[in-house]
Amino acid sequence: MLEDVIKETNDKLRSSYEVFLSDLKGIRSGSLSVSILDGVIVSTHMGKLRLNQVASLSVVNNKMLSVQVWDKSTVGAVKDAILTSNLGMNPIVEGSVLRLPVPDLTEERRKELVKVLKKYGDRAKVAVRNIRRDAISRIKVLEKAKEISENDMHALLKKIDKIISEEDARIDDAVSKKETDILKV
């Protein structure tokens, strides 16, 4: 019973952290990667799809990305999605290929990216607090139903708080590393 609460909490935290890391990949740092396009959603005749579901993405060089659209009828939608993605990219259309010149990161843009990064970090911490709240309420329900003793409840609450503190530290560490990477010229 006690292990179930711990395991469920750890599983939820792991899942939440993976979402947080995927958000971080979408923030551009010093080196260029196609992962900055992960958040681009394209409206197609099949509904809303991620960019990597309608095109092949590649890095041409340090300042250029290439998007090879599979269905020529979606080229316009892909271009619009990139323009409205707030990435600061202006696609050049060459048939079914879009070239994305990636501007150098200005000091101002770096500061904006750090703000976005911190927002993601705060959102991840809110998710962690919600997971903690759920675990605590579940533990208290178990104690009220006399399925666990009061001593077990307190021990479990301490264990949950320790796990949550470690997760907060992991989030802070990831934010700090990414911030250093963004601000590095």
Curated annotation (Swiss-Prot):
Q: Which GO terms describe its biological process?
A: translational termination
- What does UniProt give as GO cellular component? cytoplasm
The cross-references to Pfam families, in alphabetical order and at most eight, read: RRF (PF01765)
Enumerate the UniProt keywords alphabetically: Cytoplasm, Protein biosynthesis
One GO MF annotation is: ribosomal large subunit binding
| Main location per the UniProt record | cytoplasm
Task: List where in the cell it is found.
Answer: Cytoplasm
Family affiliation: Belongs to the RRF family.
Which PANTHER family does this chain map to? MITOCHONDRIAL RIBOSOME RECYCLING FACTOR PSEUDO 1 (PTHR20982:SF3), RIBOSOME RECYCLING FACTOR (PTHR20982)
Q: What does this protein do?
A: Responsible for the release of ribosomes from messenger RNA at the termination of protein biosynthesis. May increase the efficiency of translation by recycling ribosomes from one round of translation to another.
Name of the protein in question: Ribosome-recycling factor
> Which organism's genome codes for this protein?
Neorickettsia sennetsu (strain ATCC VR-367 / Miyayama) (Ehrlichia sennetsu)
Instruction: Kindly list the organism's lineage.
Output: Bacteria, Pseudomonadati, Pseudomonadota, Alphaproteobacteria, Rickettsiales
- From the UniProt record, report the name of the gene that encodes this protein: frr
